[in-house]
């Protein structure tokens, strides 16, 4: 058994948790130099957590990334100082780069979890 705690922890869909684990703990983004290794690690996570619908995993990772950068932008524009600091520090660009990387390697990542 494992417990995963996020800043905004709340009950939610299991696939959302697993997608977030893959994104954050595997560092899915431009710093990954070995796509096959990242894909194997995704498979290990899927198997370890017995994810029943792994075919949706990569699209859910992309959903999280899109939601994250858009949320930072929206909240920063609305005057949230913490989100403005994140944006100013380059967090939006980092998440967008991660999104692009996952999109670029989507086929390999999806094959690994099927």
Predicted regions and their residues:
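Active-site acidic catalytic loop and adjacent metal/ATP-binding pocket
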Residues: 1-17
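Sparse, context-dependent recognition of short Cys/His-centered cofactor- or disulfide-binding micro-motifs
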Residues: 3, 42, 87
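Active-site activation/catalytic loop segments of kinase-like enzymes and analogous catalytic loops
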Residues: 18-50, 65-74
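Eukaryotic Ser/Thr/Pro-rich intrinsically disordered, low-complexity regulatory regions
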Residues: 61-63
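ATP/Mg2+ or Mg2+-diphosphate-binding catalytic cores
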Residues: 70-114
């Amino acid at each position: 058994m494992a417990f995963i705690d996020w800043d905004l922890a709340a009950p939610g869909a299991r696939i959302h948790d697993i997608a977030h684990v893959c994104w954050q703990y595997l560092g899915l983004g431009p710093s990954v130099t070995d796509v096959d290794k990242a894909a194997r690690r995704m498979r290990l996570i899927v198997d370890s957590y017995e994810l029943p619908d792994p075919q949706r995993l990569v699209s859910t990772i992309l959903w999280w990334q899109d939601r994250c950068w858009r949320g930072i932008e929206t909240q920063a524009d609305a005057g949230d100082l913490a989100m403005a600091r994140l944006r100013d520090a380059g967090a939006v660009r980092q998440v967008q780069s991660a999104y692009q990387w996952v999109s670029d390697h989507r086929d390999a990542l999806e094959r690994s979890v099927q």
